[in-house]
Amino acid sequence: STNSTVAAEYTAVRLECALDQAYRGVKYYKNNLFDSSLALQDGNCNNDVSSSIYDAQCISTTIYAIVIRNVTRALHETLWQCRAVPVSGSDIQSNCITLQVKGIS
């Protein structure tokens, strides 16, 4: 399923992935391309990413979020998704989130 998040340009926006089971690692994908700067190293919430562009947050054992600090028009219609390595079993994928930038068509 795909959710849509709308944000104004030059603001911060939080995109939240809900995963249906506990994980030990999360990778973020933008437009189906893995961004290595957004990989969570473990499921203990110890290695959250923080940079000038993104702030990745482990909220609970099944919810993970990324904050894009400064939304730009280049991010309009981008598709975001978490792919997680669960505690047991095969990889799981979260909901997909399409980012809409307000005022840009």
Regions found by a protein language model. Give the residues of each.
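Flexible inter-domain hinge/linker segments at boundaries of tandem extracellular adhesion modules
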Residues: S1, C96-S105
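Short beta-strand segments of immunoglobulin-like
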Residues: T2-A8, A12-R14
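Extracellular beta-strand/loop-rich beta-sandwich domains predominantly from IgSF
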Residues: T5-V6, G43-S90
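Structural signature of extracellular immunoglobulin-like
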Residues: A12-Q21, K27-L33, H76-V87, I97
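Intrinsic-disorder/low-complexity, polar/charged segments enriched in Ser/Thr/Lys/Arg/Asp/Glu/Gln
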Residues: A12-R14, I63-A65, I92-C96
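N-terminal V-set
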Residues: L19-I53
